[in-house]
């Protein structure tokens, strides 16, 4: 059976004053590390997003399609559209 934790109130699960005092010296260091790591992650994400939004895919050739195949695809699309309503 688990022992009750002396650093948390067993009814409210709030930290005890001793636990708060023990964590206090690390708070700003942890927030700084979080800010740095979060900033790096966000900057990589935004750089990638902006880089990908600049590409217009003009250099990718579109394969030719027959008119009959195009008509069949349009019919299939319209049927699925009607079924989803």
Swiss-Prot record:
Gene Ontology cellular-component terms for this entry are: mitochondrial inner membrane
Query: Per the UniProt record, which residue ranges are transmembrane?
Result: 26-48
The membrane topology of this protein is: Single-pass membrane protein
* Keywords on record: Membrane, Mitochondrion, Mitochondrion inner membrane, Transmembrane, Transmembrane helix
Its annotated compartments are: Mitochondrion inner membrane
Q: Which organism is it from?
A: Komagataella phaffii (strain GS115 / ATCC 20864) (Yeast)
Question: From which lineage does this chain's organism come?
Answer: Eukaryota, Fungi, Dikarya, Ascomycota, Saccharomycotina
The UniProt function text for this chain reads: Required for assembly of cytochrome c oxidase (complex IV).
Q: Which gene encodes it?
A: COA3
| Quaternary structure note | Component of 250-400 kDa complexes called cytochrome oxidase assembly intermediates or COA complexes.
PANTHER family annotated for this entry? CYTOCHROME C OXIDASE ASSEMBLY FACTOR 3 HOMOLOG, MITOCHONDRIAL, CYTOCHROME C OXIDASE ASSEMBLY FACTOR 3, MITOCHONDRIAL
User: Which segments does the topology annotation call Mitochondrial intermembrane?
Assistant: 49-85
Q: What is this protein called?
A: Cytochrome c oxidase assembly factor 3, mitochondrial
């Amino acid at each position: 059976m688990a022992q009750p934790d002396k650093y948390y109130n067993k009814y409210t699960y709030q930290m005890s004053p001793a636990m708060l005092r023990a964590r206090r010296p690390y708070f700003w260091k942890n927030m700084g590390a979080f800010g740095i790591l979060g900033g790096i992650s966000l900057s990589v994400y935004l750089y990638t997003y902006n880089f990908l939004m600049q590409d217009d895919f003009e250099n990718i050739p579109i394969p030719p399609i027959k008119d009959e195949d195009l008509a069949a695809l349009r019919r299939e699309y319209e049927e699925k559209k009607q079924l989803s309503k």
